[in-house]
Amino acid sequence: MLSFVDTRTLLLLAVTSCLATCQSLQEATARKGPTGDRGPRGERGPPGPPGRDGDDGIPGPPGPPGPPGPPGLGGNFAAQYDGKGVGLGPGPMGLMGPRGPPGASGAPGPQGFQGPAGEPGEPGQTGPAGARGPPGPPGKAGEDGHPGKPGRPGERGVVGPQGARGFPGTPGLPGFKGIRGHNGLDGLKGQPGAPGVKGEPGAPGENGTPGQTGARGLPGERGRVGAPGPAGARGSDGSVGPVGPAGPIGSAGPPGFPGAPGPKGEIGPVGNPGPAGPAGPRGEVGLPGVSGPVGPPGNPGANGLTGAKGAAGLPGVAGAPGLPGPRGIPGPVGAAGATGARGIVGEPGPAGSKGESGNKGEPGSAGAQGPPGPSGEEGKRGPNGEAGSAGPSGPPGLRGSPGSRGLPGADGPAGVMGPPGPRGATGPAGVRGPNGDSGRPGEPGLMGPRGFPGAPGNVGPAGKEGPMGLPGIDGRPGPIGPAGARGEPGNIGFPGPKGPTGDPGKNGDKGHAGLAGARGAPGPDGNNGAQGPPGPQGVQGGKGEQGPAGPPGFQGLPGPAGTAGEVGKPGERGLPGEFGLPGPAGPRGERGPPGESGAAGPSGPIGSRGPSGPPGPDGNKGEPGVLGAPGTAGASGPGGLPGERGAAGIPGGKGEKGETGLRGEIGNPGRDGARGAPGAMGAPGPAGATGDRGEAGPAGPAGPAGPRGTPGERGEVGPAGPNGFAGPAGAAGQPGAKGERGTKGPKGENGPVGPTGPIGSAGPSGPNGPPGPAGSRGDGGPPGATGFPGAAGRTGPPGPSGITGPPGPPGAAGKEGLRGPRGDQGPVGRTGETGASGPPGFTGEKGPSGEPGTAGPPGTPGPQGLLGAPGILGLPGSRGERGLPGVAGSVGEPGPLGIAGPPGARGPPGAVGAPGVNGAPGEAGRDGNPGNDGPPGRDGQAGHKGERGYPGNIGPVGAVGAPGPHGPVGPTGKHGNRGEPGPAGSVGPVGAVGPRGPSGPQGIRGDKGEPGEKGPRGLPGLKGHNGLQGLPGLAGQHGDQGAPGSVGPAGPRGPAGPSGPAGKDGRTGQPGTVGPAGIRGSQGSQGPAGPPGPPGPPGPPGPSGGGYDFGYEGDFYRADQPRSPPSLRPKDYEVDATLKSLNNQIETLLTPEGSRKNPARTCRDLRLSHPEWSSGYYWIDPNQGCTMDAIKVYCDFSTGETCIRAQPENIPAKNWYRNSKVKKHIWLGETINGGTQFEYNVEGVTTKEMATQLAFMRLLANHASQNITYHCKNSIAYMDEETGNLKKAVILQGSNDVELVAEGNSRFTYTVLVDGCSKKTNEWRKTIIEYKTNKPSRLPILDIAPLDIGDADQEFRVDVGPVCFK
């Protein structure tokens, strides 16, 4: 098919050849006339080609300094994010320093790249006339000149006979266009013309527009697994997953470097009583202590010296029963147990009922957090030794061998952009490129206008004189000849085009004032006005009522350890009291107050060991007996069997201090004693061995902000990673596979199992107070009610090890073994293996809230707020008159940054910028694909301390070191054999009291004894604390519908809603009354000469006479004056009419009007054809062809967009979905509204035709955008303010089944201009969502899927904005 331009060219060629043929015939019969007048001025030509791009502007001034970066991680989190810290880490973040002064202006940046070509400029003004060019070459020979002036008239000849009819004259100049005549009668149908010669094949046409999208094909066979794609770009950090289950207990790591000495720790839990060490030298006499309870009868002692008789003591008064003692403090938390097997997922329980608001706790004083001390070797905890004075720190250990290469760390936060470097030198000019391909031949130009008539030719030579004619006789004037035969009818011409508007007539007389017309019908609703300026700041509203308490939050991270309390002052040491004689066993009474101490009696003789008697019944409480006289010491009897334990007796009176007895034999190791009171400070012990590396302490306080560093050099550019397209967000992965089992650690001693501590009861939630200044970090809250099971998170990092549980109760004492032969001194045994950890203790009671911390420093400026909703397009204004040129404006501020240009050439290395502040922790990103092997890393940091080396050779004896800190309890020695009793020595004098010796090494644990006799039934224990909240029960049956609540008070007036869409066009109004007569038009200009009249009658006969009179009285006439009536020359007018009709049709195609009969292809075509038009509704036909399926759209000429409205534009507000159990995204159109998706129809166009037009619109555009407004009542649309995440955001469905989401791949995420639906306030709010893309196939939006719906009080409605293509 011929293109439009080809058709037009052929037509013009045909017409030109036809005119040329006619002209040649005319020239054969008529001589060329004189030069005609100059033609009228032609119409304005089309706009010229676009001007070349302007030169680049000068670089703008440097921008203002940016705001300070966000604060770094707090001290408490630094340790969690950096496991490589050694020793003391940095402290908590210091206060933010003041904002620095703006930096000096940077050097001007490098020249920017050439910007994109601008829009074609307006045609420039006609330039001044150029200088006169050089003379041209001689022209072609001119045409024949005009005929010379007529010669003198010859003598009059004889009247000749009437001549034949002359040839018709040349057609006259076209006359001015006449006013439109009445429609002529329909002409007869012409004969079909002969078939034309087959034309040459036309030039290949341009590529047609792509056809409609075909129906979706059947799914193909499953393809082979493709090669793994390139590594995708790192996704945005996902939200932090829940803390995973505690990992298995890892193997013991190598000992670390010695940590710095920590501060004094808290008083540790009571340890197991250690085995009795060998007896130390006798201590100083202590102050008299309070008598202890009566012990069991001891073995008879050796005979003592006879003491003096003591004075009889007064019987003590029986004390009243004491009040019950206060409740003991909860025990320390036990160690975390090994990870149990993963339980099966329980069914989701119903939401728990809201607890009552508790009273606000008293503020506790916030203590400074002490760094953790170095971790000691794990063993049985011995009794607290006397604290030695801290010795000097030992020398640092040798540097360990470098550790194995660590895994690559996470990307650090982006540093602050350094100052721009100086501008580099201009590079050398590039080599001239090869010549480009020659351009395509242009289309043939339109036929130029007809040239002006040539200049008159030279006068021709005079003709020969003719022969003398014979004188004729004067004839009579002849009669008028008959009219000629009627010419053949011409072909019916094309209907002439509509003539141009005639010149205005002369002003008419002023008419009478007409009657007032009838009131017109109301016009159509105007488009919404542009958004007004923001109103003044409103008065601050009163404080709202306190909202209901929120649901319990997620369980917080464990709080930092509290500071250790001040160690209590050591009590004064009491004198050990002597045991009184046991009284008779009374019945077990209530515990009385301690009686006064009785006087001490002399030691009795050692009696023989009697058999164990049966336990007597508890007797009544007896009166204290009179102190008996001391008996003489008896001989030592054999040891009897242990008797059953009698009931505790009443405390006896305090005895007098006895004299020092003989030194007894060294007894067997006694049972573990109770924990002793802290002793006095001992002398510093010898320096201990270097301790293992301590755990990393928490971050220390941030140092003051350092001065700004000088700019460093720019680092080398790293290797470019593969450009992977980021895939769509994957679902959260299942927990990762269990890691390989670590190497088996050395077996520890079997530690005693600690008792389970009581459960702390959770305090009730307090009422929400007004938001205070940021306090210091509080303790972890009680666990909330069990929520619905969330999606499976990724496996979290192993949880921290639990606190070691308190030691269990001591085992029963074993039987005394048989005495074996004395063995040789054995070697020191190796350290026993570490015992298994005790079960985890329960959470303690929630401590009181701390006092509110001081107000933190002002926060960094928040991120830029979301863009406001674009205002509704205003009504197109009428085109204003052209204004006068304005005064030259002042230089404007630098404009916004342009679109990012292509990457510049590599600049010189810039200076290293100051280290940026640590950014806030981002949400954990989704797992990326495994990256390629990175380049070899730099040398790692010093590795951990290696395993203990083999013992070296014995070195020389060093000098005595300064006394070190108290060393750890040594390993337990083996149980020695009992020595033979030595002979009793004579009593020596009492020696001076020596200093207290250091504690001896702990003996190894004895064999487990046989179980002792069953003790008496203990007192009933105190009521235990409440247990942990059980798992939610099975869902109960649905309760009956509650009675409707009372109507709440009217809410405050909501914000003004968005302007509604423009109303439909109003009906056409009734015709108005006939207006008054117009003013008479001005005098028209003189028309062209009319066609020549018919030939005149023959002239009168000449005068008779004998002379020759060749007088000629006819007027001269010009050759271009018509001499024949127009009816005789119809063919020229047909050609003229045809040409004009064709020209009008071509103009119509080239400059569409945007009407239904003459639609444009897109709004861009209309804007290019009519740049003076304003935005509004026009008709377009993207698929071209027949105009019956043209569609009416809104053309925004300011942006060049074509916008199509949805039908309907509003989804009404109601509770669309009732199901509070299922919480998932529900598609509004597909599921809720019965499969009715959003439609974009235009009146008079079917859905299929509209789909075709939309498909062409997408092909013709390279950019599309659309807005959706979600009006909500108690429904989250995007950000959930309570949780701070986007998990409840709505999903949109695009045209090609792509889902547009709130987070994930940036190509499929929408943006939010206004987010009012972030919390549930029982009021109507709105969220405006916008999606812009350079893939028009994704729009328009067809459906929306909210998640947070289903409850009785949740309603929503949707406004679907127009889809705009560009």
Curated annotation (Swiss-Prot):
<feature type="compositionally biased region" description="Low complexity">
    <location>
        <begin position="470"/>
        <end position="489"/>
    </location>
</feature>
<feature type="compositionally biased region" description="Basic and acidic residues">
    <location>
        <begin position="34"/>
        <end position="44"/>
    </location>
</feature>
<dbReference type="InterPro" id="IPR050149">
    <property type="entry name" value="Collagen_superfamily"/>
</dbReference>
<feature type="binding site">
    <location>
        <position position="1186"/>
    </location>
    <ligand>
        <name>Ca(2+)</name>
    </ligand>
</feature>
<keyword id="KW-0479">Metal-binding</keyword>
<feature type="compositionally biased region" description="Low complexity">
    <location>
        <begin position="384"/>
        <end position="408"/>
    </location>
</feature>
<comment type="subunit">
    <text>Trimers of one alpha 2(I) and two alpha 1(I) chains. Interacts (via C-terminus) with TMEM131 (via PapD-L domain); the interaction is direct and is involved in assembly and TRAPPIII ER-to-Golgi transport complex-dependent secretion of collagen.</text>
</comment>
<feature type="propeptide" description="N-terminal propeptide">
    <location>
        <begin position="23"/>
        <end position="79"/>
    </location>
</feature>
<keyword id="KW-0873">Pyrrolidone carboxylic acid</keyword>
<protein>
    <recommendedName>
        <fullName>Collagen alpha-2(I) chain</fullName>
    </recommendedName>
</protein>
<feature type="compositionally biased region" description="Low complexity">
    <location>
        <begin position="951"/>
        <end position="974"/>
    </location>
</feature>
<feature type="binding site">
    <location>
        <position position="1184"/>
    </location>
    <ligand>
        <name>Ca(2+)</name>
    </ligand>
</feature>
<dbReference type="Pfam" id="PF01410">
    <property type="entry name" value="COLFI"/>
</dbReference>
<feature type="glycosylation site" description="O-linked (Gal...) hydroxylysine; alternate">
    <location>
        <position position="177"/>
    </location>
</feature>
<feature type="compositionally biased region" description="Low complexity">
    <location>
        <begin position="513"/>
        <end position="531"/>
    </location>
</feature>
<feature type="disulfide bond">
    <location>
        <begin position="1203"/>
        <end position="1364"/>
    </location>
</feature>
<comment type="function">
    <text>Type I collagen is a member of group I collagen (fibrillar forming collagen).</text>
</comment>
<feature type="signal peptide">
    <location>
        <begin position="1"/>
        <end position="22"/>
    </location>
</feature>
<feature type="compositionally biased region" description="Low complexity">
    <location>
        <begin position="300"/>
        <end position="321"/>
    </location>
</feature>
<feature type="modified residue" description="Allysine">
    <location>
        <position position="84"/>
    </location>
</feature>
<keyword id="KW-1015">Disulfide bond</keyword>
<feature type="compositionally biased region" description="Low complexity">
    <location>
        <begin position="863"/>
        <end position="876"/>
    </location>
</feature>
<feature type="compositionally biased region" description="Low complexity">
    <location>
        <begin position="423"/>
        <end position="434"/>
    </location>
</feature>
<keyword id="KW-0272">Extracellular matrix</keyword>
<feature type="compositionally biased region" description="Low complexity">
    <location>
        <begin position="981"/>
        <end position="1001"/>
    </location>
</feature>
<feature type="region of interest" description="Disordered">
    <location>
        <begin position="27"/>
        <end position="1131"/>
    </location>
</feature>
<comment type="similarity">
    <text>Belongs to the fibrillar collagen family.</text>
</comment>
<feature type="compositionally biased region" description="Low complexity">
    <location>
        <begin position="893"/>
        <end position="932"/>
    </location>
</feature>
<feature type="compositionally biased region" description="Low complexity">
    <location>
        <begin position="95"/>
        <end position="132"/>
    </location>
</feature>
<keyword id="KW-0964">Secreted</keyword>
<feature type="compositionally biased region" description="Low complexity">
    <location>
        <begin position="279"/>
        <end position="293"/>
    </location>
</feature>
<feature type="binding site">
    <location>
        <position position="1183"/>
    </location>
    <ligand>
        <name>Ca(2+)</name>
    </ligand>
</feature>
<keyword id="KW-0176">Collagen</keyword>
<dbReference type="Pfam" id="PF01391">
    <property type="entry name" value="Collagen"/>
</dbReference>
<keyword id="KW-0106">Calcium</keyword>
<feature type="compositionally biased region" description="Gly residues">
    <location>
        <begin position="634"/>
        <end position="643"/>
    </location>
</feature>
<feature type="modified residue" description="5-hydroxylysine; alternate">
    <location>
        <position position="177"/>
    </location>
</feature>
<feature type="compositionally biased region" description="Low complexity">
    <location>
        <begin position="225"/>
        <end position="254"/>
    </location>
</feature>
<feature type="compositionally biased region" description="Basic and acidic residues">
    <location>
        <begin position="738"/>
        <end position="747"/>
    </location>
</feature>
<feature type="compositionally biased region" description="Low complexity">
    <location>
        <begin position="668"/>
        <end position="690"/>
    </location>
</feature>
<feature type="propeptide" description="C-terminal propeptide">
    <location>
        <begin position="1120"/>
        <end position="1366"/>
    </location>
</feature>
<feature type="compositionally biased region" description="Low complexity">
    <location>
        <begin position="756"/>
        <end position="765"/>
    </location>
</feature>
